[in-house]
Design a protein with these regions (language model features):
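Short helices/loops that flank or line small-molecule/ion binding pockets
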Residues: 77-88, 104-105, 171-175, 236-238, ...
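Conserved C-terminal helix/tail region of periplasmic/extracytoplasmic solute-binding proteins
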Residues: 363-418
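C-terminal lobe and pocket-closing loops
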Residues: 269-281, 290-385
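A structural signal for short loop-to-beta-strand junctions that line the ligand-binding cleft
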Residues: 82-83, 87-90, 118-154, 288, ...
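Conserved N-terminal structural module of periplasmic/extracytoplasmic solute-binding proteins
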Residues: 2-15, 21, 25-100, 269, ...
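Hinge/lid segment of periplasmic solute-binding proteins
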Residues: 96-147, 161, 165-167, 284
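Glycine-centered hinge/linker elements that transmit conformational signals in sensory
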Residues: 170, 213-247
Length: 418
């Protein structure tokens, strides 16, 4: 879900470069890491300027040069599986939901940051890059967080004090004109489990449970757990009153908010420019608590060390760069800023000055990382489809039946290896 479409300003990069040089770690003796030592990193074109400066600052004290290569972001994971060892990267950038696949195939290796370094990150950010069948291990250094929030047009509504307040305002606005919609949340015929997740979590829903060891358990499916089903009648109520309508797709939702035909919009930081240039005051907050805190799904971007680094004789160096230097607050500011996202590092997060970005960061507190195990691929369609069926207006399926059927379909797909 992470979209990397914005660039870090030249001024910020320059400032970060100076800070990186000041904070560069003490170097081992030059003979231990001769100047010929090179680390190859696959990044996309948006990240390259920031990564170049970070690797240069780190490498100068270690006699290491960075070979930062632009690689088609959508092909990094698949290409890592087929690349010849001599052409393989030592480090890659990628979203946290690649981890289960890559770790299960032995393509990325665990990291062991110092306790003081890990303390600078919220637990859910570290959890996003953790994977294991018996014990969770950290397989990546998170640097950017992405999540949806509730955008409020302050000209048409006030920031809701509760879910009941939100519901009352949204429906009152809808009644003012036949062109208005209560809530601009995208679904469409294909569904959108990602944008709907705050409602799902707020009713007690979850995708997968965990083992006693804390690892994700694909056999423990929470799509139709008892608590959620107990609260599912609220979805039927929202459908009847028109608070949520699955006929609203992404384009419809965006246009309604921009044209002021919706006072509320569920969206993410990829629409930051839209919010800033809307022509009316906007505030982004977390959706108010329903029965439980309405937390969003989190998408997390990070760097991972590949198995090839050891074969290239740079395994320890790659781990030091990713598991320590890239996790420092100054590095995190540059990396997250490069694609207009909120830093994973808490210290770096405090330095964010962009008000909209900061609001999205706050809206993501306590968020749930999208499950990074392969079985998540069996969830999206059916979970999104359950919302579509239960909120399509006239003729909708009861939420209890829609989500119970979805849970069964997901379990069947997982059992068959789908």
């Amino acid at each position: 879900m992470l979209k990397m479409h914005t660039r870090l300003g030249t001024v910020l990069l320059a400032a970060v470069a100076v800070a990186l040089l000041i904070l560069a770690p003490g170097a081992p003796a030059a003979r231990d890491h001769p100047s010929a030592t090179q680390i190859t990193i696959w990044v996309d074109n948006v990240q390259k300027p920031a990564v170049d400066k970070i690797v240069d600052a780190w490498g100068r004290t270690r006699g290491v040069t960075g070979n930062v290569l632009i690689h088609d972001f959508g092909k990094i994971r698949d290409d890592l599986k087929t690349v010849k060892a001599e052409n393989a990267p030592d480090i890659i950038v990628g979203p946290h939901d690649w981890v289960g696949d890559l770790a299960a195939n032995g393509l990325v290796v665990p990291l062991f940051p110092k306790k003081a370094v890990k303390a600078q990150f919220p637990g859910y950010a570290l959890q996003s890059f953790s994977y294991g069948t018996t014990t969770n291990r950290l397989y990546g250094a998170p640097f950017a967080l992405e999540n949806v929030g509730l955008a409020v047009n302050l000209r048409l509504a006030h920031v809701p004090k509760s879910f009941a307040d939100f519901e009352k305002q949204a429906l009152a606005f809808k009644r003012k004109s036949s062109d208005n919609i209560a809530l601009a949340v995208p679904q469409g015929s294909g569904g959108d489990a990602y944008h709907m997740y705050p409602f799902f979590s707020g009713l007690g829903g979850y995708v997968f449970g965990r083992t006693k060891a804390g690892t994700l358990n694909a056999k423990k499916i929470g799509v139709a757990n008892k608590t959620f089903l107990k609260n599912a009648s609220l979805i039927d109520k929202w459908n009847r009153e028109g608070l949520i309508n699955s006929k609203v797709d992404y384009g419809t939702a965006k246009n309604a908010f921009v044209k002021q035909n919706a006072a509320f919009w569920i969206t993410g930081p990829w629409e930051a420019d839209t919010l800033k240039t809307a022509g009316f005051p906007v505030r982004v907050v977390q959706l108010p608590k329903i029965k439980f805190r309405s937390v969003p799904f989190l998408g997390v971007q990070g760097f991972m060390v590949t198995k090839f680094a050891a074969g290239h004789a740079v395994g320890s160096l790659a781990k030091d760069l990713v598991g320590d230097y890239m996790m420092k607050s100054v590095s995190q500011r540059a990396l997250a800023g490069a694609n207009g996202r909120f830093p994973a590092n808490k210290i770096a997060g405090k330095s964010v000055t962009d008000s909209i970005l900061k609001q999205f960061g706050t809206a993501g507190i306590g968020g749930v990382p999208m499950p990074n195990i392969p079985q998540m691929g069996s969830v999206w369609s059916d979970l999104g489809g359950a919302w579509v069926k239960a909120t399509k207006g006239a003729g909708a399926t009861s939420a209890r039946n829609a989500f119970t059927a979805a849970a069964r379909a997901i379990a069947s797909k997982i059992a068959s290896g789908g």
